[in-house]
Amino acid sequence: MEKKLLYISVNSKPEELSASKTVARSFINSFLEKYNDFKVEEVDLYKEHIPRLEYQYFQDRNCVISEEDAKKLPEKDQKEIRKIRELCDQFISAEMYVIAAPMWSLSFPAPLKEYIDCIVQTDKTISLEKGKKPKVIAILFHKRNCIAI
């Protein structure tokens, strides 16, 4: 059975000018030589539209509104909600992640934060334990590997 490696690049530079993208590509090529049961799916966060989260998209913390409620919103908002779901589903479908992101101003580029906001969804990638001290529990950690370059 073929597994998926999701390559997430977060740099506006072309690969030949980006150290993080160059190292990531070299790693992926070497990895695929050894593990040929993986296929690569790429997402470039500078080319891909990443929705900015709006309050009306959510019914609860990190929980996108239902399909039925989304239909009550303007088409533009419905499109954004579909994109959020699509990005989250794409992330969930991978067994391994390679993230190529430079360090800018002691952090990573803003599109990566926007992407993380889209994929961190209750009952999909996390669960929220309510109580006096609420806890966030990762759902996918037991079978996923992530390499940040």
Q: Language-model features: where?
A:
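Short, glycine-/small-residue-rich phosphate/pyrophosphate-handling segment
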Residues: L128-I149
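Conserved nucleotide-sugar donor-interacting segment of glycosyltransferase catalytic cores
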Residues: Y97-I99, L112-K135
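N-terminal beta1-alpha1-beta2 submodule of the flavodoxin-like/Rossmannoid cofactor-binding fold
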Residues: M1-A101, L106-A110, E114
